[in-house]
Amino acid sequence: MESSEPLVLDVGNLKRGEIIINMGPQHPSTHGVLRLEILTDGEIVKDVIPHMGYLHRCYEKHAEKLPYNQVIPFVDRMDYLAAMNSEHAYAMGVERMLGIENDIPKRVEYIRVLVAELNRISSHFVAIGTYGLDIGAFTPFLWVMRDREHINRLLEWVSGARMLYNYIWVGGLFYDLPVGFEERCKDFISYLKPKLAELQKVIIDNKIFIERTANIGVLPLDLAINYGITGPMLRASGLKFDLRKVDAYSVYPEIDFDIPVGTGAVGTTGDCWDRTHVRVAECFESVKIIEQCLEKLLGEHKRTREFDPQAIVPKKIRPKVMDFYVRAENPKGELGFFFRTTGNTDIPFRCKVRAPSFVNLSVLQAISKNVMIADLVAILGSFDIVMGEIDR
C-alpha cells in the first residue's frame, strides 16, 4: 500500500547548483496560503510541489452535521469569489434529490442565472486583475476592481451581502429582486460593454502582456483531460466543454451564448495567454446571458404581486436513500457535490465536494518543469485558484 505522506523534495540528492526554496505560504503571488516547494538550478525550475491545507475549515464535516438549507452559508465560503455559482450548484443538487427541480418557478430560475452570471464576471475580474499584478501590470487591477465594485453593489442590493450571500435556497430564493433592480442592472450592462472592449484592447492585445504570457505554461489538451481539468483552463486548451451547454441545467438551454476556446492565436494553444483570453471572452458571453435574463424578467416572467420566491422551499427535506452527484459550471470549472443520504433525516450522511481549483492545481507540477521562476508565477496566476475551495 502506498504511503499517504505528502510529496517532498529530497534534500539528500541535490546536484551541484540546485537549491530548494519555498514560495509561500505568505507570498502574494500564491493567491492565498499556498506553499510551493521549488527545486531550482539558478533561475530554472527543475521541479515544484504544491503544499496545501493551511486554510482547512472542515466544510465537508460541517455538512454532515447541519440540515441541507443551513449548509449554504458554508458553501459560500469555499469559492468566496463566486458564492452565487456555488449556491446555485448546491441548491440544484438537493432539488434533484427531492424531485422538485421541475417545480421551481421560471422567474426563480432566471434570477438564479442572472445573479450567477454577474458573479461569474466578478470572479473573472478578480482573476484578470490579480494576474496583471502577478506579471507586473498594476493599473488594470484598479480598473477591474472599479468595475467589479458595481457588481458587488448590485449583489448587495439583492442579498444584503457583498460576497457571502446565502441568497439561493433549496427550492427558491431568500428574496425576490428589489424593485428597480432590472433597470439598474441594464444600465450597468450598458456601462460594462465598452469597459470590456477596453480591457480586451489594453490587456489581452497588449504587446508586453503577450510577450509575458504567450508560449508560457502550455497545457496540452490530452494532459488536461487526463488530469480532469475543467473550466476556462480546459477550454483554453481547445475543447468546447461547458456544463451550461453539456448538462443544459436550469434555464441555460433557453439562452443563446457561445463557448470561447483557446486557439493559440498569439502563441500555443493552452498557454497562459489563452487562459486569460478565454476568461475575458467569457465575460462578453455572460453579458449576453444577463441581457436575455433581464428581457425575460421584464417580460414573460415579470414581477407580480402573487409571486413568492419561497413558495417551493420545502419545510422538511427528507431525500430517499441514494448516492447522488450533481455538477455545475463555476468560474473555475466543474463544481460537483456528491451526496449520500440515509432517508430518515434532513442531514446528509456524506457530502463530498469536487472543487475545480483543487483539481486544476494538480497539473502545476507537470507543466512547470524547466521554466524560469518568474514564469512559474505567471503560470500559477493563470490557473485562477482560490484556496478556500482547495482546502475546504
Swiss-Prot record:
Its main location: membrane. It holds the Pfam family Complex1_49kDa. It comes from the Bacteria. It is found in: Cell inner membrane. It is a peripheral membrane protein. GO terms for cellular component: plasma membrane. It catalyses: a quinone + NADH + 5 H(+)(in) = a quinol + NAD(+) + 4 H(+)(out). Keywords: Cell inner membrane, Cell membrane, Membrane, NAD, Quinone, Translocase, Transport. InterPro entries: NADH_Q_OxRdtase_suD (IPR001135), NDH1_su_D/H (IPR022885), NiFe-Hase_large (IPR029014). GO terms for molecular function: NAD binding; NADH:ubiquinone reductase (non-electrogenic) activity; quinone binding. Its EC number is 7.1.1.-. It is an enzyme of class 7 (translocase). Belongs to the complex I 49 kDa subunit family. NDH-1 shuttles electrons from NADH, via FMN and iron-sulfur (Fe-S) centers, to quinones in the respiratory chain. The immediate electron acceptor for the enzyme in this species is believed to be a menaquinone. Couples the redox reaction to proton translocation (for every two electrons transferred, four hydrogen ions are translocated across the cytoplasmic membrane), and thus conserves the redox energy in a proton gradient. NDH-1 is composed of 14 different subunits. Subunits NuoB, C, D, E, F, and G constitute the peripheral sector of the complex. This is NADH-quinone oxidoreductase subunit D 1.
